[in-house]
Every structure is written in C-alpha cells, then in structure tokens.
C-alpha cells in the first residue's frame, strides 16, 4: 500500500517525477509542479494521466483550447 501524502514528502524538486508503483507494465508516477515548469512534449507509446491533488494546472494541448484543472480533477492525455 502507498500513502500519496507521504510519497509527496520525499519529493524535493519540482517536475522530477517519482515512480511510486507499477501496474500492467505501466508506471504510476507523482510529481510536484510549479508555474510553467512542464516542457512541451508528447508520448507516442502511452497515454498520460493527470490527477490534481492540490492547487491547479493550466493544461495546453495541441489544437485544443486551454483549460484549468483543479483539485480532484482527472484527465487523460491520449498518445499521439
């Protein structure tokens, strides 16, 4: 069993994802994000799931309107 609050306490750098478990050959990672620290990128082989624990995140997707995710929001970015 994993405690996400305790796992976050071990992260001391922003946008430095940490693997907390694995399921069906996929990693479950957590990260602290501040400001615009996420570099633009895409995933060709896997989807990416975002779940907001605290705060909010401005989500920008190619050819889509921007939107803001807030606490307890979940969103999946499909692979390209």
Where are these regions (language model features)?
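A short, N-terminal "cap"/entry segment at the start of jelly-roll beta-barrel domains
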Residues: 1-31, 40
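Short, surface-exposed charged micro-motifs
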Residues: 19, 49, 58, 66, ...
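Short beta-turn/strand-loop junction motif enriched in small, turn-promoting residues
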Residues: 35-38, 80
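Structural motif
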Residues: 27, 37, 56-58, 74
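A cytosolic small-molecule/anion-sensing beta-strand core signal
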Residues: 24, 53-54, 70-71
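Short acidic-glycine-tyrosine-enriched beta hairpin
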Residues: 63-80
């Amino acid at each position: 069993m994993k405690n996400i609050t305790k796992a976050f306490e071990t992260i001391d750098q922003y946008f430095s994802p940490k693997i907390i478990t694995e399921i069906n050959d996929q990693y479950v990672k957590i990260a602290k994000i501040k400001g615009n620290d996420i570099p633009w990128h895409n995933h060709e082989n896997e989807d990416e799931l975002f779940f907001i624990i605290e705060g909010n995140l401005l989500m920008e997707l190619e050819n889509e309107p921007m939107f803001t995710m807030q606490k307890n929001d979940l969103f999946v970015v499909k692979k390209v």
